[in-house]
Amino acid sequence: MATIPLFFSLILFLRLYHASRLEKRKEVEGEGIVAAEDLVSENDNPQGDDEVLPVHFIDQAAIVRTSIINYTFRYNEVLDAAKLHRGLLQLLKIPGWNKLGGRLRATKNGKLEIHVPRSFSKTRPEVKFSHVDCSDTEIESHGLASQLPRPTGSTPSIQEGCHAFRSFALPTDLPNNIEHYWKNDQPMLSLHITSFANGTLVGLTFPHSLTDAMGTSEFLKAWSNVVAGKSSFVKPLQGTQVDVLGDVGTNLDKKASQGEFFLEDQQTRGFSLLSFIARYMWDVKTRRSIRTKHIYLPAKYMSHLRQGVEEELKRQNGGVVPFVSDGDLITAWGARMVMSSSTWKNCSAVICNVFDLRGRLKGTFARGGTYLQNLILPATTVLSKEEAATATTAQIALGLRKAIVEQTDDVQSRRLMRIARRWFSSMGSMPLFAKWDSRVVACTNWTKAKFLDAADFGPNALIAGGAGNQKSSSTRKAARHTEPTQAQTQPGRPVMYWGTTLSVTDNPRDTFVIYGKDKVGNYWVHAYLREETWSLIQKELDSFR
């Protein structure tokens, strides 16, 4: 939920209450949910001959459609900016991929559409492209670039967050207001490249309604294949005209309608919903000390964290160690830090883990197909007031794993989608399974997206004969002998990236984004936390040194 003026918060408050009452009445009356057609309006096409593509159901949800997303990749070589731009334009010529060159439109009834020019031109380009040339300056000598996050060996650390590096992410004339895309004939996709003497930063910005993290990963793979001269490897783009989830969770989906979702009876409604919203609004209004920072968790620290968790789980489970993933460990560790903060005393908690529907729904997705849309839902772990106050990292991690197992298989995902359709349609938000006094910890894990692999342009993307690239090559060779705890990269492969939302109204709190790990197991996490939580994390990391 975004940070908005108090008046509009009150309007939203009343709207959500009305929507919850309406939803309850519909369920009592037995009203079914029918499959929604992705209709487009010819009357809202300002150019007349544009190809009009639908924006699909989850993409239309308010929590998604109001967000702008950015990913920025750091390379230790000097890449050819013009070649990257040409490769992107070439990708958009492959059937279906021209969707990336569309314009986002809001129709008179508020529905979003993508309008793709039949032919692109200088006045209507495929992509908003910008290039900043700092090729006479090394990254380490640049005032801002020298502060970019970097590994600190086997020692965990807290470093500057994404928003400090906005100038490397997108051009200065690109507003962080989603209405900019709706009202102007501007491409959805912005490519912003900053070239240094010994490195390159590549920023991609677009409305979140275009796609999610896994879709972005597929886009990056396609783009890098084109740049590498492997256009034949580009997978076909699916679902441009028809929502792959069109029938999922509707009355046409028997798996969804013939039983309840695991947490169905724990949906937040009525007085509990009113109370929850009021508490959240008050927290947003009175506690504004949210700071965005990166957390570097080296493989050595992850091993330490896992050892402690598994020893506790072994004692509690008769010598058997239940499986918990690295994502479970990091999310549980972060949630424990948040719930130990003073503002979290004496309240229950829910932990929302965003999961990807690709591969979970049987018989829904085309084999080998690529989908540029949002295919995400939340898996929810509910903690009572007592559990929130006393649960250990190990207990939370096991609870997270249990929630994922129970809530994300084919049938349960479809039933959650049925509930999500009601919540998206009436309130524009993800389904909420919380108590009146609950606080929410949110986490999204991008490890499976493998962004560092997806954005690997290879040596073909480097400027031929560049002095900076020759120096980078020498640096890599030396690093092999001096930095065994750091992953060594191949030319044209990013060494790090960051991702964040940019909307002017967006102000997440108690939120973690797990970027993933490098080849030797070091993790990067981006978080939006209160000052007191950051202090607790710093103390925790200091105790490991």
UniProtKB/Swiss-Prot annotation:
Glycans are attached at residues 70, 198, 346, 445. Pathway: Secondary metabolite biosynthesis. Pfam families: Transferase. Induction: The botrydial biosynthesis cluster genes are co-regulated by the Ca(2+)/calcineurin signal transduction pathway, which is under the control of the alpha subunit BCG1 of a heterotrimeric G protein. Expression of the cluster is also positively regulated by the cluster-specific transcription factor BOT6. One of its GO terms (molecular function) is acyltransferase activity. Its EC number is 2.3.1.-. Gene3D superfamilies: Chloramphenicol acetyltransferase-like domain (3.30.559.10). The active site is at residue 208. Residues 466-493 are annotated as: Disordered. The keyword Glycoprotein applies. Residues 1-19 form the signal peptide. Keywords: Acyltransferase, Glycoprotein, Signal, Transferase, Virulence. It is an enzyme of class 2 (transferase). Belongs to the plant acyltransferase family. Acetyltransferase; part of the gene cluster that mediates the biosynthesis of botrydial. Botrydial is necessary for colonization of plant tissue by the T4 strain. It is a strain-dependent virulence factor since highly aggressive strains like SAS56 or B05 still retain substantial virulence when botrydial synthesis is impaired, since they produce also botcinic acid. The first step of botrydial biosynthesis is performed by the sesquiterpene synthase BOT2 which catalyzes the cyclization of farnesyl diphosphate (FPP) to presilphiperfolan-8-beta-ol (PSP). PANTHER family: FAMILY REGULATORY PROTEIN, PUTATIVE (AFU_ORTHOLOGUE AFUA_3G14730)-RELATED (PTHR31896:SF69). This is Acetyltransferase BOT5.
